[in-house]
Design a protein with these regions (language model features):
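Active-site neighborhood of HAD-like aspartate-dependent phosphohydrolases
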Residues: 1-42
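Short, charged, surface-exposed secondary-structure boundary motifs
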Residues: 112-115, 157-166, 180-182
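Residues at the starts of beta-strands that form the adenosine-phosphate
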Residues: 75-76, 125, 147
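Substrate-recognition "cap/lid" segment bordering the active-site pocket of phosphatases
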Residues: 83-127, 135-141
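N-terminal/domain-start segments enriched in small and hydrophobic, helix-friendly residues
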Residues: 27-56, 107-129, 180
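Short acidic-hydrophobic, aromatic-tinged amphipathic segments that line or gate anion-handling sites
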Residues: 102-108, 168-176
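Short, acidic loop-to-helix structural element flanking the phosphoryl-transfer center
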Residues: 37-39, 48-78, 84-91
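Acidic, Mg2+-coordinating phosphoryl-transfer loop and its flanking beta/alpha structural elements
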Residues: 128-172
Length: 188
């Protein structure tokens, strides 16, 4: 998502987007002046992207095949950090690339939402996959028994962000990650 968002900012607003692992407030600068985009404007731009540009997001290599394998042994829930107003567009965007699983919108740390999912579904084992280190920390705090895989499928972004200290493993390719996930889900 990040590279698609950055491409959109560049083409539509002449804003350079350089992801920063710990401070989203430092990620956007006006190309002509080098000045930071104000934080309130940043959130408006992000909302604007999700309102009109979600279709720019493309399928991550090997994701569809990996999810197909995982779906054979587990329920898949996509926990997306978007407001509820974007639920229908997120479902449509995922459906357009062949991903058809339950989608839940969330704002903030994902630990409470993961905890509720575990309470509601009572799985024997659960695996959480996310690109944001803070979400791994949140899940570790709320549900330490959940396996946590840090994955950043965008290679440009992956080079910028260190492995999440609260994740059990960092794998940035679904073709490799699926075996790690399946091992956790099917262990006795």
């Amino acid at each position: 998502m990040m590279s698609h968002f950055g491409d959109w900012l560049s083409s539509e607003y002449d804003i350079d987007f350089v992801p920063q692992p710990e401070d989203f407030g430092q990620t956007m600068r006006y190309r002509h002046s080098g000045e930071l985009v104000a934080k309130d404007k940043m959130w408006l731009l992000l909302d604007g992207f999700f309102k009109t540009e979600m279709h720019r997001q493309t399928l991550v290599p090997h994701a569809l095949e990996a999810l197909g394998r995982i779906d054979e042994v587990a329920d898949i829930v996509i926990l997306t950090n978007l407001g509820d107003q974007f639920h229908a567009s997120r479902v449509a965007q995922l459906d357009a690339v062949g991903i058809r699983h339950h989608v839940i919108c969330n704002l903030g740390g994902k630990g409470p939402a993961v905890s509720k999912l575990v309470d509601d579904r009572a799985p024997a084992r659960a695996v959480f996959v996310d690109d944001i280190p803070g979400h791994h920390r949140s899940v570790a705090e709320h549900r330490p028994e959940v396996w946590r895989l840090h994955m950043i499928a965008d290679p440009v972004i992956a080079r910028l962000i260190a492995p999440a200290p609260d994740a059990h493993k960092r794998i940035d390719d679904w073709a490799e990650a699926v075996d790690w996930i399946m091992d956790r889900l099917t262990q006795d």
